[in-house]
Every structure is written in C-alpha cells, then in structure tokens.
Design a protein with these regions (language model features):
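Short, intrinsically disordered, charge-balanced linker/junction segments flanking boundaries
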Residues: 1, 199-204
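Rossmann-like NAD(P) dinucleotide-binding subdomain of oxidoreductase/dehydrogenase enzymes
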Residues: 1-103
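ALDH superfamily catalytic-core signature
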Residues: 34, 67-201
Length: 204
C-alpha cells in the first residue's frame, strides 16, 4: 500500500474482518492525512466485495483465504487485471549441508515469527538431513531466545478461532522447543516440532 501511494496511485483498501480494530485505525489515519476520495477504506461484506471487484482496477493485491482468492482471480480475469494473490500454503526451506546453520536458523526463525507467523509467505517447514537436525534446532532455539527473551506471551494470534486451530495442530507431535500457550491472551509460544509424519494435518 505504501509503495502504491508513494508512486502516485489511488488505492482502495479492504481491511480483513479478522482485524477490525486495525482496520478502523487505518481508516481514521488515512482520512486524517489523505484524501478519502482517492484512498477510501471499504468495509463491505463478501457479497459487497464481489460487487466492488466488478470495477476495473489497474492492479489487485489480495491476502486471504484461497476460497475467496478464486473469486478475486475470476473477477480480475474479466479485465485481464494483474494480480498478486497471497493465500498461504506450505513454504518449505531446504538446508544444504554446506550452509551456515546459525545464519540459516536465524533467518528462518525471523521469517517464520514475523507478525507472529501470520504471513502467507512465512517459512513453513525445514527439510534437512538427520545429521543437521540437532544443530539446526540448537541455533533455532538460540534465535528464538534472542527474539523473544523466552516470553511466551509475545506472539498473540489474531482470533480465538485461529488460536484453537493452531494449538490443535500441535496434538500428538514431538515438541523440540516452545509449546506453551495462553488461551486468555490468545498467545502461542514460537514452537519447533520434529519428525512430523507427512500425513499430519500440520503439513497439509
């Protein structure tokens, strides 16, 4: 959004219904400093958003579920509108035996923990040889300790629904680091699990 505004474009912003307070903050701030006719914040529901997508945009950037992403994609096709669809997925990281494990672990943990892991392009799982696993986990735990100072309550999840969904994914897994949760604060400590079966829900 910042890049689009800086380049001189008008921008229509549709906040997520999961982050209502942030959406209102964004709406209030934009109205205070920018022309709301050029930078409107749209609060419509799913059906109203579909109507909005009937307009001819120069570019559409969407972050959200794959289900509604299909709707965005179909609407963009009507005008051959360029799109970026950021809809999650499994993002593997492969560690070669020649890699600097400390550097790799630090970068992977930073990418995974940014915004409490709630970004669609975050690293999702690590592929490495068994001989590298122990040292990787050691460096990953050290990185998490530097980032969070062992505070399990520094990673809030956006909604109670997603808190329950994510904590449910940990059931039956071997936890190598982290694992503490706080339902009241919707916090999940950054957690590393190992030797996950390929058919486990966390890998789907």
């Amino acid at each position: 959004v910042v890049g689009a505004i800086a380049a001189g474009n008008c921008v229509v912003i549709k906040p997520s219904h999961n982050s209502h307070n942030f959406g209102h903050l964004l709406d209030t701030t934009l109205r205070k400093y920018l022309d709301p006719e050029c930078f409107p914040v749209f609060w419509g529901n799913a059906d109203e958003t579909k109507e909005l997508l009937e307009e001819k945009f120069d570019y559409i950037y969407y972050t959200g579920s794959a289900n509604f992403g299909k709707t965005v994609h179909l609407a963009a096709n009507k005008y051959l509108t360029p799109t970026t669809l950021e809809m999650g997925g499994k993002n593997p990281v492969y560690i070669d035996p020649s890699a600097d494990l400390e550097l790799a672990a630090t970068r992977i943990m930073w990418g995974k923990c940014f915004n409490s892991g709630q970004t669609c392009i975050a690293p999702d799982y690590v592929l490495c040889t068994k001989s590298l696993q122990k040292n990787f986990i050691k460096h990953a735990k050290a990185a998490l300790s530097r980032f969070y100072k062992n505070d399990p309550n520094s990673c809030p999840i956006v909604t109670h629904y997603h808190f329950k969904r994510v904590t449910g994914l940990l059931h039956g897994l071997t936890v190598a680091a982290g694992g503490r949760t706080d339902p009241l604060l919707k916090c999940i400590e950054p957690t590393i699990v190992v030797d996950v079966p390929s058919n486990h829900p966390i890998l789907q």
